[in-house]
């Protein structure tokens, strides 16, 4: 059975990249959602959540906090993909218990 990996990406630019990278690995199913659809992601309790920070307009720390405070997703792994190299920004994101 495939593990659902939700990719939060408002312009859907990273979905094809992840699907191509894992095309030979049928264990993972990548599902793209927009930030306004976060409730769908939380309701389905995914195996992993990947957030493309460069494609969303929402504050990444508050989005991660929303995921972490959801009772069913407190331990769901979160990976943030970002081009932001600011050290303080990384620390702020890591404080929300995510991988950067």
Regions found by a protein language model. Give the residues of each.
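Two-component/phosphorelay signaling modules centered on CheY-like receiver
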Residues: 11-36
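Short acidic, S/G/P-rich loop/turn micro-motifs used as interaction or catalytic elements
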Residues: 11-14, 51-58, 84-87
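Conserved phosphotransfer microenvironments
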Residues: 37, 47-71
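Short hydrophobic patches on amphipathic alpha-helices
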Residues: 41-42
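His-Asp phosphorelay/catalytic-motif detector in bacterial-type signaling
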Residues: 45, 72-77
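Alpha4 helix (beta4-alpha4-beta5 surface) of REC/receiver domains from two-component response regulators
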Residues: 58-62, 85-100
């Amino acid at each position: 059975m495939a593990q659902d990996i939700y990719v939060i990406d408002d312009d859907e630019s990273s979905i094809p990249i992840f699907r191509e990278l894992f095309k030979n690995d049928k264990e993972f199913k990548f599902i793209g959602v927009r930030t306004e659809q976060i409730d769908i992601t939380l309701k389905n309790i995914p195996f992993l959540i990947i957030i493309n920070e460069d494609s969303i307009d929402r504050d990444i720390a508050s989005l991660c906090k929303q995921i972490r405070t959801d009772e069913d997703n407190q331990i769901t792994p979160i990976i943030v993909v970002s081009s932001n190299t600011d050290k303080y920004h990384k620390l702020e994101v890591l404080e929300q218990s995510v991988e950067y």
